[in-house]
Amino acid sequence: MAGLRVEVISLFPDMFAAISEYGITSRAVKQGLLQLNCWNPRSYTEDRHQTVDDRPFGGGPGMVMKIKPLELALADAKRAAGGKAKVIYLSPQGRQLKQADVRELANEEALILIAGRYEGIDERFIEAHVDEEWSIGDYVLSGGELPAMVLIDAVTRLLPGALGHAGSAEEDSFTDGLLDCPHYTRPEVYEGKCVPEVLLSGNHEHIRRWRLQQSLGRTWERRADLLDSRSLSGEEQKLLAEYIRQRNDS
C-alpha cells in the first residue's frame, strides 16, 4: 500500500523538519506510510529579489501573496502527487478542523496544503484552485505552517501502522466524540496522591466503566458542546448522571 502523499507549499519549508525528523510522523515517513514534500513559491519567481508578495488593492496594512508563484508551485506539487490530490488552504476563514474531518482526510491518497503568510493570498488563487479551507482555531498565527503541521500530525496518527499500539488512535480524545479519561503510571503513590483503586483492581469491566465515566464527566465539565452533538447510550447517561451527582455531593 502506498503511503499518504502530502505536498506542502510554504515560504518556510525548513519548518517541516519538525514533521519529517521527530516523533510519530518521522517514523511514518521512514516506514513509507507518509511521503512529505515541500515547494517554496520563491523558487518560482522571475526577479532577483524573489518577490512573492505585493501591496493589497484598496490599501490597508500588510502584504498579500501573489498568484503566479503559487500557481507554478501548485502545478509541480500536483505533478508530484499524481492523480487527484485535494488542495487545502490553511486559513482563519476556513471551517474549524474536527476529528471527524481528520478521519476523512486520512482516507485521501494525496493532500496539497497551502501555507499562507502575510495578510493571506490573492483570493483569485483560492477561487481557482482550493478545494477546502480549514482553520485549527479562533486565534491569530503568523502563517499557515503550524496549522499545516497540526493537520499532518493528526492525519498521520490515523494511518494504519503509524502508531505503536493499534488501539491508541481509537482511544484518543475526540475519537468517539468525548475527551480522554485521566491516565496514571508508576509510582502508585506520589506526594500522598494515589492512583484510583479501580485501575489497580485488574477488573477490566470496572476499569472500562470508570474510564468511560471519567471521559463523559470531563467532557461535561470542559466541553459540554461536544455532548450536544452526541447521542448518549443508556449506559453513558447513567454513568454521567452518577458522575454529576458525585460532583454535586463532594
Curated annotation (Swiss-Prot):
It is found in: Cytoplasm. It catalyses: guanosine(37) in tRNA + S-adenosyl-L-methionine = N(1)-methylguanosine(37) in tRNA + S-adenosyl-L-homocysteine + H(+). GO terms for molecular function: tRNA (guanine(37)-N1)-methyltransferase activity. It comes from the Bacteria. Keywords: Cytoplasm, Methyltransferase, S-adenosyl-L-methionine, Transferase, tRNA processing. One of its GO terms (cellular component) is cytosol. PANTHER family: TRNA (GUANINE-N(1)-)-METHYLTRANSFERASE. Specifically methylates guanosine-37 in various tRNAs. This is tRNA (guanine-N(1)-)-methyltransferase. It comes from Stutzerimonas stutzeri (strain A1501). The gene is trmD.
